[in-house]
Amino acid sequence: MLYCVQFGRRVIRLVSATVHGFFLTLLAMFKPKVTLRYPHEKGPLSTRFRGEHALRRYESGEERCIACKLCEAICPAQAITIEAEERSDGSRRTTRYDIDMTKCIYCGFCQEACPVDAIVEGPNFEYSTETREELMYNKEKLLANGDIWEEALRYRIKKNQPYY
């Protein structure tokens, strides 16, 4: 008799749990969907989102980087390589500015360390490649990225929304 009572309680618990699960599923079916169909729909990005790197220019077209190498020194992943030379007017400019995006951890230290806001992490997060070599960004690629995003970066500065 005791065995039948225990068996009955187990059956009741099992049926109760199953009905509860079905009820939760039924409730979820009528809630609004929160899933985005990614390639066609994109969610909002934070104003402080850190994406693909870029080098900025002054409005005159001259690159901002003064080759102080603070970004290279502060990078915990050692992803940045800079070579510089002195110009005839005494100022220093970069001859080589490389970022290995396979090493980068997107911490934002490089743009925080930059005294002239030359290096930034822009809003682009869709930069997949077919080879690892394409993730080695040189100075020309970084300057091209900066030219593409300059309007978005200016807007953030105007709205007093820093990019880190």
UniProtKB/Swiss-Prot annotation:
Membrane topology: Peripheral membrane protein
GO cellular component: plasma membrane
GO molecular function: 4 iron, 4 sulfur cluster binding; iron ion binding; NADH:ubiquinone reductase (non-electrogenic) activity; quinone binding
Enzyme Commission (EC) number: 7.1.1.-
Subcellular location: Cell inner membrane
GO biological process: aerobic respiration
Domain 4Fe-4S ferredoxin-type: 56-85, 95-124
Cited NCBIfam families: NuoI, PRK05888.1-4, PRK05888.1-5
Reaction(s) the record says it catalyses: a quinone + NADH + 5 H(+)(in) = a quinol + NAD(+) + 4 H(+)(out)
Pfam family, one: Fer4_7
Cofactor(s) annotated in UniProt: [4Fe-4S] cluster
Gene: nuoI
Highest taxon in the source lineage: Bacteria
Annotated residues for binding of [4Fe-4S] cluster 1: C65, C68, C71, C114
Family recorded in the similarity comment: Belongs to the complex I 23 kDa subunit family.
Binding site for [4Fe-4S] cluster 2: C75, C104, C107, C110
InterPro entries with a match to the protein in the record: 4Fe4S_Fe-S-bd (IPR017896), 4Fe4S_Fe_S_CS (IPR017900), NADH_quinone_OxRdtase_chainI (IPR010226)
Cofactor binding remark: Binds 2 [4Fe-4S] clusters per subunit.
PANTHER family, A to Z: NADH DEHYDROGENASE [UBIQUINONE] IRON-SULFUR PROTEIN 8, MITOCHONDRIAL, NADH DEHYDROGENASE UBIQUINONE IRON-SULFUR PROTEIN 8, MITOCHONDRIAL
Keywords per UniProt: 4Fe-4S, Cell inner membrane, Cell membrane, Iron, Iron-sulfur, Membrane, Metal-binding, NAD, Quinone, Repeat, Translocase, Ubiquinone
Record note on quaternary structure: NDH-1 is composed of 14 different subunits. Subunits NuoA, H, J, K, L, M, N constitute the membrane sector of the complex.
Function: NDH-1 shuttles electrons from NADH, via FMN and iron-sulfur (Fe-S) centers, to quinones in the respiratory chain. The immediate electron acceptor for the enzyme in this species is believed to be ubiquinone. Couples the redox reaction to proton translocation (for every two electrons transferred, four hydrogen ions are translocated across the cytoplasmic membrane), and thus conserves the redox energy in a proton gradient.
Name of the protein this chain belongs to: NADH-quinone oxidoreductase subunit I
